[in-house]
Amino acid sequence: MIWKTKRGILDISQQARVMGILNVTPDSFSDGGDHLGTETALVHARRMISEGAGLIDIGGESTRPGSAPVPAEEEISRTAPVIAGLRKEWDGLISIDTSKAAVAAAALEAGADVVNDVSGLQADPEMTGVCARSGCGVVVMHMQGTPRTMQSAPVYADVVREVREFFEERLRTLTAVGIEEQALCFDPGIGFGKNLEHNLALLRALDRISAGARPILLGISRKSFIGKILGTEDLSAREWPTIAITANAREKGVMLHRVHAVRPNVEALRMTEAILGVTG
């Protein structure tokens, strides 16, 4: 399996890759305010790279439940300097986490290779054109509602079928407007417009929800459904369960994992792959 990005082809046919989360926001649910300022953000990016991250996902707007949008200019001012700084010193893949075409365009100009859009390229009508023209990799996430409304009362007749059908529709629509099929990657959007049972149903079905044999990116790091299962609101108590989900997802064929704590998830993936008989 390969994933085509602006920087070239990423081969994920054998070894899964970890995408390190770098939020340059004051209000993200897990690490809001921890990495504000370009140099502080770069220090954390370097740490994640040293721990084995193959991709760094940089976001300037929180998408936690109930969050409000940030103006594009503010999002650009938070993210573009970090992307440009990281690009000067690292040749790995950089992703911009945004639903705004203007932010994506600025990030790609600064050196990003991938656009990670929680709206599935539906929030901004200009986003498909930006992605198609640049030749970047594209992460298409499923979300019911918006970050502000998504957790109010999510309802599905069959969440697995509906998410898969969403990916199938996005594959048809986006390739028809010029985005290459090999540039697409799908994210089921765990915690985005889903309740606990919806999240668990999707995790059980990770090996049968994609479209066009495109890779799945999974983002479950420290999410609230873990705390609900464990009966705790302590974020630190969600780290080991995150690692357990990462290993289980790799068994189901998930090759891209978006996490906060890079090293333990990389080690969980390598151990799982050793058990599966996968060589790098």
What are these regions (language model features)?
Residues M1-Q15:
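SAM-dependent methyltransferases
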Residues D11, A16-E39:
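N-terminal binding-site loop/beta-alpha segment at the start of enzyme catalytic domains
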Residues V43-G59, K252:
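Catalytic domains of carbohydrate-active enzymes, especially glycoside hydrolases
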Residues G92, E180-A183:
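Short acidic capping loops at alpha-helix termini that bridge into adjacent secondary structure
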